[in-house]
């Protein structure tokens, strides 16, 4: 069943809140220590991923506070691996993709910050159990003593990109997928994004990268570089799946307008060379899957010839930001990237919880 917003319902947009862009000032970045071997295919794969997670946490901590969510039984190992400068929050978790488990933070554009925790079903019930991950967003907001709103649909942070000015980019493959919100129409999904994130324009791309088990998360193919500017995963011009999909997505972006009615400036980042995962599916490497930090950017390196090209593009876009590349192959082996394992909390004072 679907629920319409009633006149007396409390929601972020009625409280003057909206989701800001990722490049605004951060209070911290949230991460989660890897604990499920299944995405990496083996315990050895999980252990290699932990090395990459720890390196990413250390890189991020050079710019801002990093809080690592960790299971009680993994706390000592995680602290030893990450070293100084990382704080830890102990929760029961099932997996480590913080972008999709964490709340989406909203702000009043001044000092106040609140959060929206959405329903989570492990990317269409692909992994079990996931009850702890589904509860994590609300638990984080409770631990922060921050006002919390419950988003009335399944939504993962990696499935959307926002510019903080009312524009949101997503994919039809993910948000319209029957394994997410089968009882919601496109219009009803857009209404919920408007009400809970302050979105006034949704730009619908088509599909994501080949063999993406998240069903086309946008954070592997497109993201805002700034107001009116979109970074896009470059079509490889080989006639393959990614080539076809990304040419279609670029055509959609060129035809679209943002919430201000302006066209997008499109900047391409190269596609790394083809590699396969442990299970034979394509390894979805993407330079789009990077993290904004305070005064910097942390982006992936794949031991690929395109690493240097991607870095040059980013340095040209952000001459005033310090840009670090960190090894990410063993993260991507599990199905996600640097952006997928992080969630930014914008700077500000937590709005106090209200009982409604």
Where are these regions (language model features)?
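The feature marks the mature, well-folded catalytic cores of soluble enzymes
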Residues: 2-356
């Amino acid at each position: 069943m679907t629920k319409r917003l009633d006149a007396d319902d409390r929601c972020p947009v009625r409280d003057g809140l909206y989701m800001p862009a990722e490049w605004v000032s951060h209070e911290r970045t949230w991460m989660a220590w890897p604990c499920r071997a299944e995405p990496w295919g083996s315990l050895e794969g999980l252990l290699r991923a932990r090395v990459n997670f720890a390196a990413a946490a250390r890189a991020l901590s050079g710019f801002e506070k990093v809080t690592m969510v960790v299971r009680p039984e993994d706390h000592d190992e995680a602290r030893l691996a990450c070293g100084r400068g990382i704080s830890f929050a102990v929760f029961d978790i099932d997996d480590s993709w913080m972008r999709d488990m964490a709340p989406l933070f909203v702000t009043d554009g001044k000092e106040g910050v609140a959060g929206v925790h959405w329903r989570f079903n492990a990317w269409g019930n692909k992994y079990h159990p996931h009850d702890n991950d589904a509860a994590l967003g609300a638990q984080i907001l409770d631990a922060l003593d921050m006002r919390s709103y419950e988003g009335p649909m399944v939504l993962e942070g990696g499935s959307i990109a926002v510019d903080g000015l009312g524009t949101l980019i997503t994919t039809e493959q993910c948000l319209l997928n029957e394994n997410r919100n089968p009882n919601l129409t496109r219009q009803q999904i857009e209404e919920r994004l408007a009400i809970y994130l302050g979105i006034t324009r949704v730009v619908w791309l088509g599909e994501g990268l080949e063999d993406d088990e998240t069903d086309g998360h946008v954070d592997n193919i497109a993201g805002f570089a700034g107001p009116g500017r979109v970074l896009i995963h470059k079509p490889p011009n080989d006639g393959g799946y990614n080539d076809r999909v990304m040419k279609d997505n670029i055509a959609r972006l060129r035809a679209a307008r943002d919430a201000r009615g302006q066209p997008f400036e499109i900047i391409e980042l190269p596609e790394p060379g083809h590699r396969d995962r442990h299970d034979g599916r394509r390894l979805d490497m993407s330079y789009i899957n990077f993290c904004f930090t305070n005064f910097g950017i942390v982006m992936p390196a794949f031991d690929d010839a395109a690493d240097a090209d991607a870095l040059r593009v980013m340095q040209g876009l952000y001459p005033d930001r310090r840009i670090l590349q960190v090894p990410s192959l063993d993260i991507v082996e599990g199905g996600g990237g640097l952006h997928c394992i992080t969630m930014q909390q914008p700077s500000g004072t937590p709005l106090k919880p209200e009982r409604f």
